[in-house]
Swiss-Prot record:
Presence of the UniProt keyword NAD in the record: yes
Protein name: Fatty acid oxidation complex subunit alpha
InterPro entries: 3-OHacyl-CoA_DH_CS, 3-OHacyl-CoA_DH_NAD-bd, 3HC_DH_C, 6-PGluconate_DH-like_C_sf, ClpP/crotonase-like_dom_sf, Enoyl-CoA_hydra/iso, FA_oxidation_alpha_subunit, FadJ
PROSITE patterns linked: 3HCDH (PS00067)
GO MF: 3-hydroxybutyryl-CoA epimerase activity; enoyl-CoA hydratase activity; long-chain-3-hydroxyacyl-CoA dehydrogenase activity; NAD+ binding
GO cellular component terms, semicolon-separated: cytoplasm
Region (Enoyl-CoA hydratase): 1-190
Reaction catalyzed: a (3S)-3-hydroxyacyl-CoA = a (2E)-enoyl-CoA + H2O; a 4-saturated-(3S)-3-hydroxyacyl-CoA = a (3E)-enoyl-CoA + H2O; a (3S)-3-hydroxyacyl-CoA + NAD(+) = a 3-oxoacyl-CoA + NADH + H(+); (3S)-3-hydroxybutanoyl-CoA = (3R)-3-hydroxybutanoyl-CoA
Site positions per UniProt: Important for catalytic activity: E118, E140
Entry function: Catalyzes the formation of a hydroxyacyl-CoA by addition of water on enoyl-CoA. Also exhibits 3-hydroxyacyl-CoA epimerase and 3-hydroxyacyl-CoA dehydrogenase activities.
Biological process annotations from GO: fatty acid beta-oxidation
């Protein structure tokens, strides 16, 4: 084979063929259509070599097997027929691998996802390493697709239909031990012996057939299968609200294969893949994927980042504890926490311990790895251990004088190059830096709660922040596993600014008599993970409403909330889930009961709670205000691009991913339709709905936020 081949064949002296996978010039292996000829040439050599005892597919990359198929291939398809052909070509190649006359083993280390797992499924057996980097899954549903190279047919027959449905419908990734338990792999070994273990398995003349567990065998029968698919359809419809067509097609295709045989299943899989590839939902989800990939590669500024070897954190509360965990346990950086008392430090340490112990309990990591990661975190009630910190993150109360004091103390106790990053959600960074000796090293770094789960951070430079400070802070965010967007130092920044009118309108409709559950259900139906009122309960009613006066002072009446209602709720000691008193009823330890609204809430705000608006009207009122504010942020350059605005909304507040983000959604509606809708709502509900100048200009010029030169492709 030539040196540019992604697949290279080597026949060992013991007559086992080793096919090494190494896509030239790429950090990860992905499958491309042009590789098919290379693979077929190798398969031909294998078939012709009658002395071969077996075949092993293994990656030559350091930490991944195959991360999936190259998604750009789908974007190049002009219609469903072309996408279907792409799937059929993949199916045929996998069938040729499966048809080899000798044992074929996939030796897996690192990510084995999508088309990579479909290739592994076409092999006769699979062995993987016990490394934390090794994960196996079929995440195509997250792109609005289904596995198109045989995955919907081979996986159910290997691991059972219920396990396969769960994996394919959710896109969940299994770690090595989970994959072994599920029957997805046949053995788990240390990386050092992966190849030899695979070779030994390949030499076996007969490979024992795995027997499915009794439960899976029952579910594979006609009666069990009918019951299972009926339940899965019901649960999936409740979860997706009909917004994700891929899930229904996945269920149909798997059921077809089990009921009518593999041939019909493969045919249904290819057709469904082609049709789904052309849906607006898949196009939007792929656009989000490419946008997030580009954001993760964006350095934030043109300057090189400064040193980043250790981090300090001020405050050991909920946010400080979460920031310490992502910095040490995801970023691998030593962390020193300062709190005014040892309780705060202990809280932060316990925060990380609990998260790590859960990983140990689930066998994601070993106890030794837990101890190693926890050892990166230390604490003190003074500034001992801070002198060499490259960046210090402040996570104290939202009090401007206190934060300014923190700046002064860090400048006094840390190195001259130390960056001060504030986790404020509402205070201007320029005000925090007002008295700084080195204002160019002060920046905002806004995390979202819970820190360990929320993928977004906002990086907020003020007018004097240096380019190097921006680059260093963005670098830290990436090390923490976050997706950073750089936003301007204006009140509310970006995410909270577009979220506030959305929540305000929900509260306003509540005061008009709409029921809590009706408002929340309408927005969940629209595509949000939770409704606005439940969201307020989750983040804390006090926390979620404290920014409203800041925004109202900065931008005027359009940000005003029904103040008497908010005050009444807070005065009744209702903070949401955290104190077990909110809009919803809570059981023990603040657990929310199953969608039960506290009926006392209506009496508290003086309404009876009788819904009059349709779900579509409720969603329209909330969402249009969010979109209008997002357009203002674009106009005022609060965000650098529509791309950043879409990523910020999807990753920061759960804007429906299948719509692609607020800017792709506005482009889909069209600026003219946006303006007309806002004008209609303004006539009904008041000037807060008046379309912003940006949208009016775009409607006049027939412009879009995403230009023709910007595509959903990854290159």
């Amino acid at each position: 084979m030539t040196t540019t081949s992604a697949f290279m064949l080597n026949v060992r002296l013991d007559n086992v063929a080793v096919v090494a996978i190494d896509v030239p010039g790429e950090k990860v292996n992905t499958l491309k259509a042009e590789f098919a000829a290379q693979v077929r040439a190798i398969l031909k050599q294998i078939r012709e070599n009658k002395a071969l005892q077996g075949v092993v597919f293994i990656s030559a990359k350091a930490d991944n097997f195959i991360a999936g198929a190259d998604i750009n291939m789908i974007g190049h398809c002009q219609n469903a027929q072309e996408a279907e052909t792409l799937a059929r070509q993949g199916q045929q190649l996998m069938a040729e691998i499966q048809a080899l006359p000798v044992p074929v083993i996939a030796a897996i280390h690192g990510a084995c996802l999508g088309g990579g797992l479909e290739m592994a499924l076409a092999c006769h057996r699979r062995i993987c390493t016990d490394d934390v980097k090794t994960v196996l899954g079929l995440p195509e549903v997250q792109l609005g697709l289904l596995p198109g190279s045989g995955g919907t047919q081979r996986l159910p027959r290997l691991v059972g239909v219920s396990t396969a449905l769960d994996m394919i419908l959710t896109g969940k990734q299994l770690r090595a031990r989970q994959a072994l338990k599920a029957g997805l792999v046949d053995d788990v070994v240390p990386q050092t012996i992966l190849l030899e273990a695979a070779v030994e398995l390949a030499k076996k003349e007969r490979l024992a057939q795995r027997t499915l567990p009794v439960r899976e065998r029952i579910l594979a029968g006609p009666l069990g299968r009918a019951l299972l698919f009926r339940l899965v359809r019901k649960k999936t419809a409740q979860k997706t609200q009909g917004n994700y067509p891929a899930t229904e097609r996945i269920i149909d295709v798997i059921e077809t294969g089990l009921a009518q045989g593999s041939s019909s299943g493969y045919d249904a899989e290819a057709r469904a893949f082609g049709e789904l590839a052309m849906t607006p939902q898949s196009q939007a989800l792929r656009a989000i994927f490419f946008a997030s990939t580009k954001v993760k590669k964006d350095p934030g500024s043109d300057a090189p980042p400064g040193p980043l070897n250790s981090v300090g954190i001020l405050g050991g509360g909920l946010m400080g504890g979460g920031i310490a965990w992502v910095t040490a346990c995801k970023g691998g950086l030593p962390v020193r926490i300062k709190d005014i008392n040892t309780q705060g430090i202990n809280h932060a340490l316990k925060y990380s311990w609990d998260l790590l112990e859960t990983k140990v309990r689930r066998r994601h990591i070993k106890a030794s790895e837990r101890d190693k990661q926890l050892a990166l975190i230390s604490g003190s009630t003074d500034y001992r251990g801070f002198s060499h910190r490259d960046l210090v993150i402040e996570a104290v109360f939202e009090d401007l004088p206190l934060k300014q004091q923190m700046v002064a103390e860090v400048e006094q106790n840390c190195a001259a190059h130390t960056i001060f990053a504030s986790n404020t959600s509402s205070l201007p960074i320029g005000d925090i830096a007002a008295n700084a000796a080195r204002p160019e090293q002060v920046i905002g770094l806004h995390f979202f709660s819970p820190v360990e789960k929320m993928p977004l951070v906002e990086v907020i430079p003020h007018a004097s922040t240096s380019a190097q400070t921006i680059a260093t802070t963005v670098k830290l965010a990436k090390k923490q596993g976050k997706t950073p967007i750089v936003v301007s130092d204006k009140a509310g920044f970006y995410v909270n600014r577009i979220l506030a009118p959305y929540i305000n309108e929900a509260i306003r409709m509540l005061t008009e008599g709409e029921r809590v559950e009706h408002i929340d259900a309408a927005l969940v139906k629209f595509g949000f993970p939770v409704g606005p009122i439940q969201l307020l309960d989750e983040v804390g009613i006090d926390t979620g409403t404290k920014i409203i006066p800041v925004l109202e002072a900065a931008y005027g009446e359009r940000f005003s909330a029904p103040a008497n209602v908010v005050a009444s709720i807070l005065n009744d000691d209702r903070k949401g889930r955290k104190n077990g008193r909110g809009f919803y009823l809570y059981g023990e330890k603040g657990r929310k009961s199953k969608k039960q609204v506290d009926p006392a809430i209506y009496k508290l705000i003086g309404v009876q709670g009788q819904s009059r608006l349709s779900a579509q009207q409720v969603a329209e009122r909330c969402v249009m205000l969010m979109l209008n504010e997002a357009a203002r942020c674009f106009d005022e350059k609060v965000i650098r691009s529509a791309r950043d605005g879409d990523i910020g909304a999807v990753f920061g507040i759960g804007f429906p991913p299948f719509l692609g983000g607020p800017f792709r959604y506005m482009d889909a509606l069209g600026p003219g339709e946006m303006v007309a809708t806002l004008q209609r709502l303004a006539a009904l509900y008041g000037p807060r709905y008046a379309p912003c100048e940006q949208l009016v200009r775009m409607a006049e010029r027939r412009e879009h936020f995403w230009t023709n030169g910007e595509t959903d492709q990854g290159n």
